[in-house]
């Protein structure tokens, strides 16, 4: 079979969007879901899908993408080991260290390169998916030592063809970063929604843009939010401690002086810096040969400083560097 064959295990929001986007980019795709109703919906939309993981993994040369919630990874991997032990394997799970450890333990012969598209909505399920979900998004591609350069290039190429740009990162650095910018926001949104509701009917009647924006992700499926937050416990605890320290300082200042200048100004400057970095043109570039001995280390270094991969040709990648 062609190397541009993709098998997606799990057809919810992210897996379903991946199936759609990859098919639109010219990949031959097949999806697998446990639910017969989901498979019927996928087939009705014109895609190849099955409830049988053995059937889904029948193409020996397919790139296999795990798109299941973190707790289900350890249930799926033994079946991958049984039917496709030497496969090219990636995933779209939002926590990377537990997945990498599970792959090493349960499918040690797989050629694994992890992934995480930083995209989503508060909705879930196949019907919520979209072929354009990843357009303009960051897509982490795991760049730990030992990653197969051919598989790395294929996973990065898939992300690029789905409309994303690639951020090369090590698993530990990824988990620490997303604890702050993804998992903590989900937790804070849950707290904010509860605090607002605690104000009763009047508070809810007056709630407007700031409350709606701040609590959007609190509408996500609770089981999925718990899975990613609890699965990144150590990194999230550090982020929570940082947030509590800042809230404590704000409370202390408000109680003692009535002022919140330091907290509000720090947040304002941080948001402006984020917007500026996102909008700044990237004029500096670098090319990396993925077969070079230090390629992965260099990719991690550049990724940690905001660089992104914008093209991959065979085993050479082209990066735009942060200004």
Predicted regions and their residues:
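NAD(P)+-binding Rossmann beta1-loop-alpha1 motif at the extreme N-terminus of oxidoreductases
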Residues: 1-50, 63
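Phosphate-coordination loops involved in phosphoryl transfer and adenosine-cofactor binding
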Residues: 2-5, 86, 136
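Internal alpha-helical scaffold of NAD(P)-dependent oxidoreductase catalytic cores
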Residues: 133-219
């Amino acid at each position: 079979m062609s190397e541009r064959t993709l098998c997606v295990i799990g057809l919810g929001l992210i897996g379903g969007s991946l199936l759609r986007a990859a098919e639109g980019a010219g990949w031959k795709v097949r999806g697998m879901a446990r639910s017969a109703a989901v498979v019927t919906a996928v087939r009705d939309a014109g895609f190849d899908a099955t409830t049988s993981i053995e059937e889904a993994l029948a193409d020996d040369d397919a790139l296999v993408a795990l798109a299941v919630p973190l707790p289900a990874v350890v249930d799926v991997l033994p079946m991958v080991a049984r039917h496709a032990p030497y496969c090219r394997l990636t995933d779209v799970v939002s926590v990377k260290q537990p997945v990498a450890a599970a792959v090493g333990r349960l499918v040690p012969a797989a050629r694994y390169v992890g992934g995480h598209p930083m995209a989503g909505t508060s909705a879930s399920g196949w019907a919520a998916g979209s072929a354009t979900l990843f357009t303009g998004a960051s897509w982490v591609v795991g760049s730990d030592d030992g990653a197969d350069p051919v598989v790395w290039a294929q996973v990065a190429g898939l992300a690029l063809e789905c409309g994303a740009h690639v951020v090369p990162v090590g698993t530990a650095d990824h988990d620490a970063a997303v604890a702050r910018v993804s998992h903590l926001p989900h937790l804070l949104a849950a707290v904010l929604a509860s605090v607002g509701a605690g104000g009763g009917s009047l508070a809810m009647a007056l709630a407007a843009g700031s409350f709606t924006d701040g609590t959007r992700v609190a509408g996500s499926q609770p089981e999925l939010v718990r899975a990613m937050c609890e699965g990144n416990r150590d990194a999230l605890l550090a982020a929570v401690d940082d947030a509590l320290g800042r809230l404590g300082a704000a409370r202390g200042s408000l109680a003692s002086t009535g002022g919140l200048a330091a907290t509000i100004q720090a947040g304002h400057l941080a948001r402006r810096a984020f917007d500026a970095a996102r909008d700044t043109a990237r004029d500096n570039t670098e090319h990396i040969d993925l077969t070079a001995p230090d390629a992965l280390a260099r990719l991690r270094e550049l990724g940690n400083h905001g660089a992104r991969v914008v093209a991959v040709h065979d085993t050479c990648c082209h990066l735009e560097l942060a200004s």
